[in-house]
């Protein structure tokens, strides 16, 4: 079984913010084949199809590890893939890696604290401007919004390939270093 986690913050207040690009990609991956298997014990929205789980933690970003640990403990997936925003990559850049440090990302830090860092990551660049907290919790600019659909489509292709392949192959094929703006 593979668990794919998209990081973000719950509630409509944060729905269209940069920090929620992980949630957005989970929504793009989810189709009518998936069944909602959410439960309060998982602290998140959880969808299942065959041997694939999609998770959107509803704990707020800094406590994402609680949700990931609950699902991990219950389903015991062989593989975990976490999708998250990255301030240190230009907007629209995409990188893939296994393990490593949190890079200052509090959602990743929370997961690392509770289950370790032996999982794959899809890092989607959101760029950086001004105060980091205000920036990640801000909505995409009109110019960024013009590119969001293509970034999510590309991310969907990459994650669908990753499900069938290994992180190194996907990194070679799908890494974008420069972003779109």
Swiss-Prot record:
Biological processes annotated in GO: protein quality control for misfolded or incompletely synthesized proteins; rescue of stalled ribosome
Enzyme active site: 19
Feature type site, description Discriminates between blocked and unblocked aminoacyl-tRNA: 9
Family matches, as Pfam families: Pept_tRNA_hydro
Domain of life: Bacteria
Gene Ontology molecular function: peptidyl-tRNA hydrolase activity; tRNA binding
Family note: Belongs to the PTH family.
Reactions listed under catalytic activity: an N-acyl-L-alpha-aminoacyl-tRNA + H2O = an N-acyl-L-amino acid + a tRNA + H(+)
Originating organism: Campylobacter curvus (strain 525.92)
Function text: Hydrolyzes ribosome-free peptidyl-tRNAs (with 1 or more amino acids incorporated), which drop off the ribosome during protein synthesis, or as a result of ribosome stalling. Catalyzes the release of premature peptidyl moieties from peptidyl-tRNA molecules trapped in stalled 50S ribosomal subunits, and thus maintains levels of free tRNAs and 50S ribosomes.
GO cellular component, one term: cytoplasm
E.C. number(s) listed in UniProt: 3.1.1.29
Binding-site residues, tRNA: 14, 60, 62, 106
Alphabetized UniProt keyword annotations: Cytoplasm, Hydrolase, RNA-binding, tRNA-binding
Coiled coil ranges: none
Protein name (record): Peptidyl-tRNA hydrolase
SUBUNIT field: Monomer.
Location in the cell: Cytoplasm
Feature type site, description Stabilizes the basic form of H active site to accept a proton: 85
